[in-house]
Regions:
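AAA+/P-loop NTPase substrate/partner-engagement loops
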Residues: 117-131
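Short, basic phosphate-binding NTP loop
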Residues: 1-86
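Walker A (P-loop) phosphate-binding motif
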Residues: 73-119
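Switch II (G3) loop of P-loop NTPases
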Residues: 136-151
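Acidic, Mg2+-coordinating active-site environments of NTP-dependent enzymes
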Residues: 165-224
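Short, well-ordered alpha-helix to beta-strand connector turns
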Residues: 82-83, 108, 136, 193, ...
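Inter-motif core of Ras-like GTPase G domains
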Residues: 151-170
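Short catalytic-loop micro-motif centered on adjacent basic/acidic residues
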Residues: 87, 112-114, 138-142, 196-198
Length: 224
């Protein structure tokens, strides 16, 4: 039997909802003022998904700027002790790779690990602000993305020294459109790193990694 998770009504969701209602009212007022009667108002209700999408677009920069101090606090906290940072991304097995690596490294280090699948900009910042402390000697950060530029933005303040890419696969194609876009988005994690570890069984990733060898230490792990 399928189940639908309960949606938490966060302040952010409330703000977007209020913006949506404002746009619907605005369309209704314009419709009546311009002599269309209730035609555009009815159309606004029929295409409410489109108006909600516009509300999300309008609120994007506001929400990003509002969260900037939160991100800055996380960056300052993580980078204050100049500890090694490992960033992990890929189309699959990010969390598993992170947990296995953390288990190995925790034998001789006090390791900070982003919990569960906290792998977006705000989730990573929340994990660092709430869980990272001066006793940690190493950090492992999982990074996910739905579009180009997201991982680059995360890396600009997480600053990974070592980057891991688990593999490239046709995941989230409804947003990413192509495997090439997925590869480009995931590859953003290597830009600031000195060393890169990749899945050596992924031919597409191997070909891309050849472009990094002059500037990075590149290691491929393979079971074949």
């Amino acid at each position: 039997k399928s189940r639908t998770s309960k949606v938490d009504k966060t302040e952010r969701l409330n703000r977007v909802t209020y913006c949506y209602y404002f746009l619907v009212v605005l369309v209704s007022i314009f419709s009546y003022t311009l002599g269309y009667g209730y035609f555009l108002a009815l159309a606004a209700n029929m295409f409410s998904y489109f108006i909600f999408d516009q509300a999300l677009r309008l609120m994007f920069n506001y929400e990003k700027n509002k969260s900037r101090p939160f991100i800055n606090d996380a960056s300052k906290k993580l980078n204050s002790n100049a500890i090694p940072v490992i960033g992990i991304t890929g189309s699959y097995s990010k969390t598993t790779t992170k947990n296995v690596l953390a288990k190995i490294l925790d034998e001789s280090n006090n390791v900070f690990v982003t919990p569960e699948s906290y792998n977006n900009r705000l989730g990573i910042a929340k994990a660092i602000n709430e869980g990272f402390n001066d006793d940690h000697e190493l950090a492992i950060i999982e990074m996910g993305t739905y579009s180009n530029g997201e991982i680059r933005e995360i890396c600009s303040w997480v600053r990974p020294h070592v980057s891991v890419i688990t593999g490239i696969a046709p995941v989230h194609l409804e947003r990413m459109k192509s495997l090439e876009n997925i590869l480009d988005a995931k590859s953003e994690i290597v830009e600031l790193a000195g060393s890169v570890v990749i899945n050596g069984d992924d031919e597409m990733l191997l070909n891309e990694a050849r472009l990094w060898t002059n500037q990075k230490n590149v290691y491929d792990c393979s079971i074949t």
